[in-house]
């Protein structure tokens, strides 16, 4: 269209339709419906000389010849806006609220378009009982005030990271190319925070899938926005299977044939949220503390599913910023994250354990890209889960209540001898010690090594040992400020860790494995 000669004539009688000239790109006239479940419409206007708006029709002139469109074929009266830039995404009516009349602006309760706000990729609905002000969404029995615009701000930051950096969705190949993710604020004072996705229909009856989440004002304000980012993270996890099919995206459990629950959703959602609020990752007084108390557990153990949100930093340092999203998209039913990791990267079980051990050694001093500076005040805070066998000979054994499991680890704070001293750990893996739980003892395996840190921040990593009986050693460097001994449970063969909220944990015979060990130190000892 020649925009210099373009002119717009609006009939005075037609005040119900808005036709703003929003951009120089006037090759298309776009229609955005007030019923946000109705797909946007478009009218070609390329090469037009002028557009005339009358009380009953739209005339588009090309070389003086008019082409007319009656309004009834384009928009319902008082039901749409017309514009020269694409209105972007619309909404899918979720099956969750299939019986809700979103066009009933007079409703006193429930959800409708009149009680919603939108951004480029998200829509926020609040229950009409909260009132009309999107900036003051407050339950009479609760003190928290949610602001729908603040929710959108956090959500859009999530989009930039989860889609733009982490790769959970691929623009141009995603349902989010058409549909906005929907977030709802229910009318209740109690805690509620959940998200995933659902199927639904547009106004034309076309089915699709969309991300959907819920949080009360309490949850919307929690953790400085981290809870919002966590729940939005779940919608992106769901969208993996929406885009690629349910054999991708870990919509299954790990009992061998895909049934049960999946704690990896929570682990990754917390890590995703920390990418939005990185300043909270080592300071919020919550998940890091839980992590310190639980990292001896199986990597996929449900008891620390919210706190297992630190290994992802190592994996993305090792394999790229988008690796977590890549794992989600390339996962295949019924494999768990360890199996997916190994398959995607072509690693053997030994190679996987070696990579994990390197990560845990780095975690001793948080020598990991992206967290190295923010976590430096946390160095030395790992707990020593050992019991003394013989203090005189510096002999210790893994504590039975905190013994390492598959891919669980101990980071033990050690005393620092003088520079040049050779410290040793004479290690014995135990497969028949009394009091421990053995599962597949024939698959027993360990990794163990020393780590030293110098005053200038340089790290020195000792050679990793793997023998059931062996010796790890390290020569203490100059200006050594910290010394650690790291041990990891490294089974020689992987097996899944099932979890089902409706089944007692004791029902799973393959769970609860322990890899105890005894170690006798020379020239150093643990500092409890």
Feature locations, PLM:
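Zn2+-dependent metallopeptidase catalytic core
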Residues: 64-67, 72, 76-210, 218-232, ...
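Active-site-proximal alpha-helical
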Residues: 289-367
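Beta/coil-rich, acidic/histidine-enriched accessory regions frequently appended to metallopeptidases
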Residues: 334-528
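Compositionally biased alpha-helical segments
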Residues: 24-94
């Amino acid at each position: 269209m020649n925009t210099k000669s373009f002119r717009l004539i609006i009939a005075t009688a037609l005040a119900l339709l808005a036709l703003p000239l929003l951009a120089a790109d006037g090759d298309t006239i776009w229609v955005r419906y007030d019923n946000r479940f109705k797909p946007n419409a478009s009218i070609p206007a390329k090469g037009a000389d002028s557009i005339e708006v009358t009380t009953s029709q739209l005339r588009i002139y090309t070389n003086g010849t008019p082409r007319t469109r009656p309004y009834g074929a384009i928009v319902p009266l008082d039901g749409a806006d017309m514009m020269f830039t694409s209105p972007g995404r619309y909404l899918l009516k979720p099956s969750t609220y299939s019986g809700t009349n979103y066009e009933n602006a007079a409703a006193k309760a429930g959800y409708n378009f009149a009680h919603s706000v939108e951004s480029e990729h998200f829509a926020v609905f609040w229950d009409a009982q909260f009132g009309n002000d999107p900036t003051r969404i407050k339950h009479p029995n609760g003190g928290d005030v949610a602001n729908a615009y603040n929710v959108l701000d956090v959500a859009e930051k999530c989009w930039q990271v989860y889609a733009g950096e982490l790769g959970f969705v691929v623009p141009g190949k995603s349902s989010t190319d058409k549909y906005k993710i929907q977030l709802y604020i229910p009318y209740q004072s109690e805690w509620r925070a959940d998200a995933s996705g659902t199927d639904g229909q547009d106004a034309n009856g076309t089915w699709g899938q969309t991300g959907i989440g819920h949080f009360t004002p309490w949850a919307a304000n929690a953790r400085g926005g981290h809870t919002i980012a966590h729940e939005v993270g779940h919608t992106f996890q769901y969208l993996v299977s929406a885009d690629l099919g349910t054999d991708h995206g870990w919509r299954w459990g790990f009992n061998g044939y895909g049934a049960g629950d999946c704690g990896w959703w929570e682990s990754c959602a917390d890590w995703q949220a920390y990418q939005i609020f990185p300043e909270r990752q080592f300071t919020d007084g919550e998940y890091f503390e839980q992590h310190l108390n639980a990292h001896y557990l199986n990597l996929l153990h449900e008891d620390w599913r919210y706190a297992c949100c630190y290994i992802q930093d190592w994996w993305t340092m090792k394999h790229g910023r988008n690796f977590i999203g890549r794992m989600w998209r390339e996962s295949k039913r019924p494999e768990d994250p360890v199996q997916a990791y190994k398959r995607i990267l072509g690693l053997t079980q030994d190679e996987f354990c070696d990579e994990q051990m390197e990560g845990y050694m780095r975690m001793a001093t948080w020598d990991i890209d992206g967290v190295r500076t923010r976590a430096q005040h946390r160095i030395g805070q790992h707990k020593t889960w050992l019991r003394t066998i013989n203090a005189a000979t510096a002999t210790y054994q893994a504590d039975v209540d905190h013994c390492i499991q598959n891919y669980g680890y101990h980071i033990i704070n050690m005393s620092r001898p003088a520079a040049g001293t050779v410290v040793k750990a004479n290690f014995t893996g135990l497969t028949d010690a009394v009091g421990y739980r053995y599962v597949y003892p024939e698959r027993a395996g360990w990794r163990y090594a020393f780590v030293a840190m110098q005053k200038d921040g340089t790290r020195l990593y000792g050679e990793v040992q793997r023998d059931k009986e062996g010796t790890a050693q390290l020569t203490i460097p100059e200006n050594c400020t910290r010394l650690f001994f790291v041990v990891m449970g490294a089974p020689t063969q992987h097996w899944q860790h099932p979890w089902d909220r409706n089944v007692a944990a004791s029902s799973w015979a393959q769970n609860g494995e322990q890899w105890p060990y005894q170690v006798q130190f020379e020239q150093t000892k643990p500092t409890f």
